[in-house]
Amino acid sequence: MPWLQVRLAITPEQAETYEDALLEVGAVSVTFMDAEDQPIFEPDLGTTPLWSRTHLLALFEADTDETALLAHLALLTGGDLPEHHVEEIADQDWERSWMDNFQPMRFGRRLWIVPSWHAAPEPDAVNLLLDPGLAFGTGTHPTTALCLEWLDGQELAGRQVLDFGCGSGILAIAALLLGAERAVGTDIDPQALEASRDNASRNGIEPARFPVYLPADLPQRQADVLVANILAGPLVSLAPQLTGLVRPGGLLALSGILAEQAEEVRAAYSAHFDLDPTAEREGWIRISGRRRAD
């Protein structure tokens, strides 16, 4: 079934008004999109930031009267409509389209991330089966890729791993499949913990080998390896805590860092870690190193 799509160019201040009005006039969905390819970095917790210029996309049933719709929308919002465009678009199987675009990916020498519905390209490789049904890491983002490649290059046999900000659990599960004895995950989002549990089960990992916690419940034990793919601000503010969670001689890998933020993050850890050269991909950075003996 085709749909009538209305696209409006709005400011953040107009967002709530137009979202409410579009739903009032019968939109079956309303979506916010970046109008100018502007990234949003490190929003405050509990906020839903928007770009300075945002496109608001609304879908209506195809037989909707376009003229009446726009007139009603103008009436509800109390003035002339902002720049807008109306067109008919074909229906499509969005889930199938997304699944077709998420293909197996290789990281380093041994590790593959394989969608759970896809056959493993190399059955004898280390294959991590992933179903990113919740909006967490899949390996496609440069920061996740940098961490996965780093893990693939480490000797993890018998190691205890901490995944700080675990999301889908992709980094901890990769470490376990690459030989780690046990991993612990922590995240501020309960949905992330559920996604981690589901993905661990899909890969045959028992809960005892990969317990996950909210930060307040995280046992304060030192790990042999700590990975944290979060953001530069938290990495800097949490540096004393993260340092304390790595045993002397243990390894650290940090990502979620923009190139211009690298020096600040390195400075926050350089007092206690011998840091490796910075790794970079598409403007994102990985910082890794070994904790010095106390």
UniProtKB/Swiss-Prot annotation:
This enzyme catalyses: L-lysyl-[protein] + 3 S-adenosyl-L-methionine = N(6),N(6),N(6)-trimethyl-L-lysyl-[protein] + 3 S-adenosyl-L-homocysteine + 3 H(+)
Coarse class of the primary localization is cytoplasm
InterPro entries linked: Ribosomal_L11_MeTrfase_PrmA, Ribosomal_PrmA_MeTrfase, SAM-dependent_MTases_sf
Q: Which UniProt keywords apply?
A: Cytoplasm, Methyltransferase, S-adenosyl-L-methionine, Transferase
Q: What class of enzyme is it?
A: transferase
Q: Is Metal-binding one of the keywords UniProt gives this record?
A: no
Q: Which Gene3D superfamilies match?
A: Vaccinia Virus protein VP39
Task: Give the Gene Ontology MF terms in alphabetical order.
Answer: protein-lysine N-methyltransferase activity
Instruction: Tell where it localizes.
Output: Cytoplasm
Question: Per UniProt, where does S-adenosyl-L-methionine bind?
Answer: 144, 165, 187, 229
Gene Ontology BP terms: methylation
Q: Name one GO cellular component term.
A: cytosol
Give EC number(s), comma-separated.
2.1.1.-
Entry annotated with the keyword Membrane: no
The family annotation for this protein states:
Belongs to the methyltransferase superfamily. PrmA family.
**What is known about what this protein does?**
Methylates ribosomal protein L11.
HAMAP family linked to this entry: Methyltr_PrmA
Under what name is this protein listed?
Ribosomal protein L11 methyltransferase
What is the organism of origin for this protein? Pseudomonas aeruginosa (strain ATCC 15692 / DSM 22644 / CIP 104116 / JCM 14847 / LMG 12228 / 1C / PRS 101 / PAO1)
Q: Which gene encodes it?
A: prmA
